[in-house]
Design a protein with these regions (language model features):
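Hydrophobic transmembrane alpha-helices and their immediate loop junctions
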Residues: 1-196
Length: 196
């Protein structure tokens, strides 16, 4: 179930698309009794997205749409088709960079928020095209002489990450089940988006 809406009904504002999986992702947040945890999660995610927006503003990139899904928030830009590779990579990595900076700045003072920020950084650097790290890899692989071999290696890496996450759930308990489930869903989504 997907629904879309626009902010302010004007074409100059970005289109917002909300996927049902996003609602499934955030629903458990409202079940948490500790409001600080909810605020920490929203802060970490908000600053991550602010990092992308700040880099886009610095490069003069216009935002066309925002897609909220269970995998996170994807910002779709107005592309001319001739964007420099380095500019795209900087924009993609600016979100995880903000999370890493937040982790370094808050490490000892606010360890819970710092660890959430580090987790967001590492999650977003996973090699799935819906995430920042995977999008960077897609940019680097596309058009490469060894594109087919690199895509196969990337597919194997994704499967290995899922297997590792399953082993971690087995060894360390169900607290890691959401991460393993997210990696499994990303693997399935990746498979569907690259199938003929």
């Amino acid at each position: 179930m997907i629904f879309s809406f626009r902010i302010f009904k004007a074409d100059k504002f970005p289109k917002i698309r909300v996927d049902f999986t996003f609602l499934l992702l955030i629903a458990p947040l409202f079940l948490l009794r500790d409001r600080k945890n909810v605020l920490d999660i929203l802060l970490v995610c908000g600053l991550h997205e602010w990092g992308h927006l700040a880099a886009m503003a610095a490069f003069g990139v216009k935002l066309r749409a925002v897609h909220l899904s269970g995998f996170g928030i994807r910002m779709i830009t107005k592309k001319s088709g001739t964007e420099p590779l380095l500019k795209s990579i900087v924009i993609l990595l600016s979100g995880p960079a903000v999370n890493l900076l937040l982790f370094l700045l808050m490490g000892r003072k606010v360890p819970e928020t710092a660890m959430l920020s580090l987790g967001a950084c590492l999650y977003n650097l996973l090699p799935f095209s819906q995430l920042d790290g995977g999008a960077v890899l897609e940019l680097l692989i596309s058009g490469s002489v060894h594109e087919y071999a690199l895509r196969m290696a990337l597919r194997l890496l994704r499967m290995a990450l899922f297997a590792l996450s399953a082993v971690l759930v087995y060894c360390y308990g169900y607290a890691l089940l959401p991460l393993s489930g997210a990696i499994f869903a990303l693997c399935i989504s990746e498979r569907q988006s690259h199938s003929p």
